[in-house]
Regions:
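Conserved N-terminal alpha-helix of the aminotransferase class I/II PLP-enzyme fold
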Residues: 2-51
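Hydrophobic beta-strand scaffold residues
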Residues: 16, 69, 90, 146-147
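Active-site phosphate-binding strand-loop segment of PLP-dependent enzymes
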Residues: 91, 95-148
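Active-site C-terminal subdomain of aminotransferase-like
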Residues: 142-145, 152, 157-206
Length: 206
């Protein structure tokens, strides 16, 4: 890894020289994004300098005042920061409590044009896993989007380490997958994996 990084620096330099929409959209970024997207199984992806930057910036692109975000009580603090940076309404449900999630959705979802559910696949504090199939059932019932943070499972679970969601066989039911490179990969950075449309918005606005 050290040698690959050194070689890339000598070839591409260390500065982006501009935003992704201008001079900062290098081919090596596009190739890396597509390689990882193919590996995980999503159509496209966008890289971030860090997992924190990713988590704290994406919701201002994804959500507005007509959006309800329903988040597990134990998601990472940077995700909460990102949600609070947006104009969305945040309601949190008790950790892994599907009955409480159902109550929250029943009470609030009809007041908003879009609903986003946010959880982690494996939670960092206790190492427990999300009841993903139950969440997907509620997601479908309320026509919500589902964002799953795989920071603590990517590289450890799934075929070749492609994530816990893949291991559970439900990747197609997850709208956005978030991965971080600071854990199993031993690097830095983060990546959002989703549809071509969502990734294009991220490249344009983040």
């Amino acid at each position: 890894l050290k040698q690959c990084i050194a070689d890339a620096i000598m070839t591409y330099g260390v500065g982006s020289t501009g935003s992704r929409r201008l001079s900062g959209n290098h081919q090596i970024f596009l190739d890396t994004e597509q390689y990882i997207a193919n590996w995980v199984g999503k159509p496209a992806g966008v890289l971030f300098n860090s997992g924190f930057q990713m988590n704290s910036s994406i919701f201002s692109v994804l959500a507005d005042k007509t959006t309800l975000i329903v988040a597990d009580k134990l998601i990472h603090a940077s995700l909460i920061d990102g949600i609070q940076n947006s104009d969305a309404q945040l309601v949190r449900f008790r950790h892994n409590d599907m009955d409480h999630l159902a109550q929250v959705l029943k009470k609030y979802a009809h007041n908003y044009s879009e609903v986003i559910i946010v959880c982690e696949s494996i939670y960092s504090m206790d190492g427990d896993t999300v009841p993903i199939h139950d969440i997907i059932q509620l997601k479908n019932e309320y026509n919500a989007k589902l964002i799953v943070d795989e920071a603590h499972s990517i590289g450890l679970y799934g075929v070749g380490g492609n994530g816990w969601i893949n291991e559970q066989g439900c990747l197609s039911d997850v709208d956005i997958v978030l991965v971080a490179f600071g854990k199993a990969f031993g690097l830095s950075g983060g990546m959002l994996l989703s549809s071509q449309d969502i990734v294009a918005k991220m490249r344009a606005k983040c």
